[in-house]
Amino acid sequence: MDLRGRALLGGDRLRILLMFFHAMAQTVAEQEVENLSGLSTNPEKDIFVVRENGTTCLMAEFAAKFIVPYDVWASNYVDLITEQAEISLTRGAEVKGRCGHNESELQVFWVDRAYTLKMLFVKESHNTSKGLEATWKLSKVQFVYDSSEKTHFKDAVSAGKHTANSHHLSALVTPAGMSYECQAQQTISLASSDPQKTVTMILSAVHIQPFDIISDFVFSEEHKCPVDEREQLEETLPLILGLILGLVIVITLVIYHIHHKMTANQVQIPRDRSQYKHMG
């Protein structure tokens, strides 16, 4: 074998070796994942933590439910009718994840891998009037479901594995270095590989941070969703108005008391002129 052939062979071996170590590194990173859902006081909420090199790099708390339409035969066995399966993310799910500087991913599997949820987060920088600003967002959701699973699907036609994907998704947009929090329900539509079917993903009680976690197992400052901020304002506004009204009443009473006291101390001038002779 000539020198050129040996060099090519050596280069191929080096590439294979690098690919092997890269795959091993990813595998090790994915193994550093914890399901802490048992710590949640909300039985519907799951808690997932991804750690790399002994440090938390992704934290996610949320409750998830999927509304999945599927076809069944009508009673005449000629027509098809559409039913809906409601699939909730359950505790004890298997979880994998990976963290990157600009891209992080969370994968969750449950019911013997009949269901798989994949969430992809990206961090981006944008030029604004204030300068360069970085944000992160949920850029892709994929839900794989098996309609032959009998717990949620009853006699589904063409039962089997289907994949539902988001389309041009930009959700949970949050300034970099902050966590996203939203107690209100949020819906994301997913186009299914099952023809003409749209899966609806419902998220609630969300608290997520896929980048820039400073303290282990601790979320950074929260960026609240607009719905939560509006609800918080609606809750505090009556209290603020009540305090203002109470303050106005107190001020009015004080002014009345001062005025009444000043009036009482003034010399009373008799209206009847005949009384002047008794004065002095």
Curated annotation (Swiss-Prot):
Q: Which GO terms describe its cellular component?
A: cytoplasmic vesicle membrane; dendrite membrane; early endosome membrane; endoplasmic reticulum-Golgi intermediate compartment membrane; endosome membrane; GABA-ergic synapse; growth cone membrane; late endosome
Give the main localization category: membrane
Show which residues sit on the Cytoplasmic side of the membrane: 257-280
Provide the glycosylation site positions: 35, 53, 102, 127
Species whose genome carries this gene? Rattus norvegicus
- Extracellular topological intervals: 30-235
Q: Which family does it belong to?
A: Belongs to the LAMP family.
- Taxonomically, the superkingdom here is Eukaryota
Segments traversing the membrane? 236-256
Q: Which residues form the signal peptide?
A: 1-29
State the name under which the record lists this protein.
Lysosome-associated membrane glycoprotein 5
Tell me the lineage of the source organism: Eukaryota, Metazoa, Chordata, Craniata, Vertebrata
